[in-house]
Structures are given as structure tokens and as C-alpha cells.
Amino acid sequence: MESSASSPPLTQSDPLEAFPRRTLEAGDIAVLVLYFLFVLAVGLWSTVKTKRDTVKGYFLAGGNMLWWPVGASLFASNVGSGHFVGLAGSGAAAGLSVTAYELNGLFFVLMLSWIFLPIYITGQVTTMPEYLRKRFGGNRIPIILAVLYLFIYIFTKISVDMYAGAIFIQQSLHVNLYLAIVGLLAVTALYTIAGGLAAVIYTDALQTLIMLIGALILMGYSFAAVGGLEGLEEKYFLAMASNRSGNSSCGLPREDAFHIFRDPVTSDLPWPGILFGMSIPSLWYWCTDQVIVQRTLAAKNLSHAKGGSLMAAYLKVLPLFIMVFPGMVSRVLFPDEVACADPEICRKVCSNPAGCSDIAYPKLVLELLPTGLRGLMMAVMVAALTSSLTSIFNSASTIFTMDLWNHLRPRASEKELMIVGRVFVLLLVLVSILWIPVVQASQGGQLFIYIQSISSYLQPPVAVVFIMGCFWKRANEKGAFFGLVLGLLLGLVRLILDFIYVQPRCDQLDERPAVVKDVHYLYFSMILSSVTLITVCAVSWFTEPPSKEMVSRLTWFTRHDPVVQKEQVPSATPPPLTLSQNGTPEASGTNTQFEMVQENLSKTHSCDMTTKRSKVVKAILWLCGVENKGKEQAPSRADPIIVSLEENPLVKTLLDLNLIICISCAIFLWGYFA
């Protein structure tokens, strides 16, 4: 067969081995080590350069980030190892329909800065649960949301990225899985703890460049190996495992592999689900997810946030060419491994009887690239893994510190919040390591589809609550709460059913209940959104309307309302802490001052004890950004959160023009591959 003949010769190893013994050579290791040193240098530089001794300095990078690091961080936070492995794997298994997720995300990352971000800015929020607390009042919605976000981060984002990175790292280096993961997590946590969001954004900017260079090089090698896009279209439909049973349809390429819009009933991604069901989780991710929104809140002003979103949107065009198409090429070059159809053979190839499409990208790297470039692509995968993990670590730490810990300890000092945020990162690392065996046992044949199905069960209710809060002034706390709870309960029921009734292999009879077998997860997303929307509207309409202060400057239609001095309102969570002139944390809008732990320590320890403090202790305090500065060096006042929506007219015009160009490019790609 032509596709098999074009495969590079395997080294002396088991022909069924997914990753031959051809491993990284000395040149590859040198590139990888230099990359690590460079990234750590950038992280340490940003650690020294930026303000880290305030809540905003650590969690929002001081609110002074320019458009290009914001855009690079948005892209790098989204495109992790799960994208490289998952998108390429889905491309190999089912064609380019999975590209719809990337093109769909392009629209919503722009919607974030043009529509949602102005509301968040005028509302002066740091986290998404904080927005809901201000918009609806009470604590039950923000607490439910905070716990849900942490659940999603730990058990889908972190675990998926670690599993995807492990596929590449373990097989290319032939080292113990846990040793590789623990080492990566240690480096990742180090500059996340030390530098806060500034270190994350600066390293994301560097790693975005590394990812794009390496992925573009591999794309060139991939298309050259199959004769370009025309050659891929011809050879992809011939890419079948040589040991496939002749009477079975298992392992055959899909006839609609080069189309995005597919049959609404029998296909793997029905077109109504792509247009509507996919949009709800996409809106949650790009417009209300803490990981993404936190990057735009760190921008210098609204124009820089829009510029960052535009940069990320332009980059979202690339995954089709640097991930999906290379995954399809990998199937053409290595059909016996990537396109294996027999469960026993797949088990020998990749230890997964459901299929081995997820090895498509690592297989391409290890077999196609020469020495040196393999090391560069290894660095790209490590960059993707660390970028995604640092973003999640920092954002999850922000939610835990500002929305849960601050609720439990309303009088927590600035210093305590800093320490708690860093310690929580360490706990995330521990939980992530313990979750690795579960991830290994639960992954199916297509990692990316697993991610999206889980998202479709948990994210739509949250997205609907945010939409109603931002665009319907009549929505109140009772409606949002009952809509959120009902939606999450239905989503959890479907999630549990999916785990109980596992999707059968191609050669097995599907005996699952109709609600699982016949209702596609994208259609379920539409149903879940509708139920939540109806519940929010009905309950809100028949209960009391929200107060004026819960609407003013917190919806799209009231974002330009004048700032009103609020009366003292009892709240379980105090307003954000800032630093007063004498260095003590001061609650915004009140005269209450809380003593810092540093001042309490100074009452019990003499100046001599301070000067004789262990160098190790000083180093730890500096790492946490809470080092003792002495009375003559009181911490400076934290920069105020941006509240102005004013933009330079010329800059605004250029941004709007680029918005039109970017959307036009996306519409063209939708139409070309539809």
C-alpha cells in the first residue's frame, strides 16, 4: 500500500511498538536543557521585575501588561499538551471536523474583550465568582461556582494536560512516568509560586513563540512527506491498518473527513451541535473562565486587552494547520500504529484497546524530524504543558484565596492571602500527582473528545447564569441559584451515566440507554442550556427584582452608570484589601485597618532577632513575596483596578478594523471546509 511504503523505516524493535527505540539524542537533550534554562531565566527576571507583595500584584500582574504578552498568554493558556495530542489524535481518527472548536473559540475570545470585559472592568472584579457575588448578592452562588471551577481545573484541565504530556515525555525519553511528571510539575510550580501572574504571562509569551516555531517546522515536514494538501486528501482515505479485518468497517477513514459540517443524526459531530451546542461551552471558557479572563484583567487598559484578544484570535487559525493536518498526516505515514483497529493490537501498540490515534503527534515528531529538531519539538510539548499548568495553578489559587479563604477568614491580612495562595499551589501539585493513575485508566480513544464531552455536561449552566447576569437586569439571585443547581444536577447525572455506560468499541454492540446512546453530548449541551435558561427566567420573573446597586455598572446596559457611593452593606466577604500609606492593609471604602502578620511578629521579636534571621527564612519569604522590608521601606500602595472604558479614538478604530478582518478570515475558513 502506498501509505505504508512511504513510512520511514523503523529501528530494530517490536513492529507493534508505538514508539520505537529511536529516542532523543545528545543534540536533542542539549536543546531541551537550554530551553529549560532560558524559561527559568525569564521567570526569575519577571519575578524580580514585578510587584508581588500585593494581591493585585501577584494575581493580576499589577494590571500593567501590554497587549502582546496578554495575547500570547491567552493562546498559550488555551493550547496545552491536550491540544497537541488531542487535536492531532482526533484529526487522525475522524478528520478535520474538530477544527470547529478552534474556529468557534476565535469568535468568543473577541467577544470577551469587546462585550464581557467592559462589564468586568466597571464592576471592579478580580475573579468570576466575585462578579456573581456583586451582581446577585449572597454567597451561595459564588461558593458553588468557586468549588465547581476548582473541580473542573483539577480533574479535567490539569489531569488531561499531564496525561497528554506524559504520552510524549515517557515514550520519547523512556523514563518513568511519575519521575517525568513530578519533575515538570516541580519546575512549573516553582515559578508560578515565586512570580505570580506576571511570571506566568512572561513565560507564556516566550513559550508561545517556541510552540509556533516548532509546530510550523513540523507542519512543513509533514506536508512535504505526503505531497502537500492535495496528496493528503488522496492518501488519507487509503490510510488503513494492514491487519484490519476485511469484513469490518472498523478503522476505515470517514467519508466526510475533510468536512466540518456533518450529518445531524449519525455523525460524530452533528452540524446543529457545532453551531449551537458547541457555542455555550465555548462562551463559558473564553468569556467566564478564570484562567482566560484573568489575563485580560491584567492588561494595562481596555485597548491593550482588545489587542491581546485579537492576537490570540489570529493565532487560533493556526491549530488547523499545525495540529489537525499533521495528525492526519501521521495516520497516512503510520497506519498500522495510529489507525489500528483490532483491540488486542491497539493494546500492544499504545496500551489502549479503544484506539491509538492520540499517539499521532508524538509518533510524527519522533519518526519524522532529524536530531535537534526533535529536541525543539520536545521543548514545544514541555512548553505547552508548563504553560497550561502554570495558568491553571495561578487561576485556581486566585479563586481559592479570594473567594473561599477570604470567605472563611474575612479579616485575613494581605500577607496571609499571599502565603495561602502559594501553599494552595503546592496542594494542587500533590492532588495532580495522585490523580495520574485515574487519568491513565479513564482515557478513551480520543482525548480531545473526552475533554469536550465533560465540558458539555458541566459548563452550560454556568454560561447561562453569566449571560443572564450580564444582559438581563431582571435576573436575580434566586433565579440564578435554582437555574445553576438544576442545570448542574442534570449535567452530573449525564456525566455519571457516561462513566457507568462506557462507549463500546467499534466491534461491539451498543446496548447503552437511549439517553446516553442517542443524545449526542453537543445536543445535551443545548438541552441543558435551555433548561437552565427557562429556570432562571421563570424564577426571577416571579420573585423580587434585584436592587439597583446589584445592577448598576454590572450589566452591559448599565456599564456607563455613574459611580454611586454605596452604603455600608453587611457582607461575609470584605472588599478587596489595599495597602495604606503606612503599609497596613486597608479595606476599600472603610476606615478599618488590619494589622499585618509582619507587624505582629515585630511586637514579639526584637530588631536583633530580625537582623539575625536565617538566610533560608529570608529566601523563603522573598520567594513568597512577603519579605520583611523594615519600617523605612513600607510597601507601596497597590495600583487601583482599571475602571475607565475610555479609549484613544484612533486606536479604537484600528482595533475595530482588525476585528472585522479577523472575523472575515474565520468565516472564510468555515465556508471553505464546511
From Swiss-Prot:
Q: Which gene encodes it?
A: SLC5A11
BP terms from Gene Ontology: apoptotic process; myo-inositol transport
Give the family per the record: Belongs to the sodium:solute symporter (SSF) (TC 2.A.21) family.
Which regions of this chain are Extracellular-facing, per the record's topological domains? 1-25, 78-102, 162-180, 230-272, 330-374, 440-446, 501-521
Its biological purpose is as follows: Involved in the sodium-dependent cotransport of myo-inositol (MI) with a Na(+):MI stoichiometry of 2:1. Exclusively responsible for apical MI transport and absorption in intestine. Can also transport D-chiro-inositol (DCI) but not L-fucose. Exhibits stereospecific cotransport of both D-glucose and D-xylose. May induce apoptosis through the TNF-alpha, PDCD1 pathway. May play a role in the regulation of MI concentration in serum, involving reabsorption in at least the proximal tubule of the kidney.
Ranges of Polar residues compositional bias? 578-589
Quote the subcellular location field of this record.
Membrane; Apical cell membrane
Q: How does it sit in the membrane?
A: Multi-pass membrane protein
Provide one Gene Ontology cellular component.
Answer: plasma membrane
InterPro entries to which the protein is assigned, alphabetical: Na/Glc_symporter_sf, Na/solute_symporter
Where the protein is mainly located, per its record?
Answer: membrane
Transmembrane stretches, start-end: 26-46, 57-77, 103-123, 141-161, 181-201, 209-229, 273-293, 309-329, 375-397, 419-439, 447-467, 480-500, 522-542, 654-674
Cytoplasmic side stretches: 47-56, 124-140, 202-208, 294-308, 398-418, 468-479, 543-653
Q: GO molecular function terms here?
A: D-glucose:sodium symporter activity; myo-inositol transmembrane transporter activity
Which keywords belong to this entry? Apoptosis, Cell membrane, Ion transport, Membrane, Sodium, Sodium transport, Sugar transport, Symport, Transmembrane, Transmembrane helix, Transport
Question: Catalyzes what?
Answer: myo-inositol(out) + 2 Na(+)(out) = myo-inositol(in) + 2 Na(+)(in); 1D-chiro-inositol(out) + 2 Na(+)(out) = 1D-chiro-inositol(in) + 2 Na(+)(in); D-glucose(out) + 2 Na(+)(out) = D-glucose(in) + 2 Na(+)(in); D-xylose(out) + 2 Na(+)(out) = D-xylose(in) + 2 Na(+)(in)
What organism does the UniProt record list as the source?
Bos taurus (Bovine)
User: What is the protein name for this chain?
Assistant: Sodium/myo-inositol cotransporter 2
Q: Where is this region: Disordered?
A: 567-589
Note the SS bond partners.
Answer: none
Q: Does the keyword Plastid apply?
A: no
Cell membrane found in the keyword field:
yes
Q: What's known about how it's activated or inhibited?
A: MI transport activity inhibited by D-chiro-inositol (DCI), phlorizin (Pz) and sodium (Na(+)). Insulin increases D-chiro-inositol uptake.
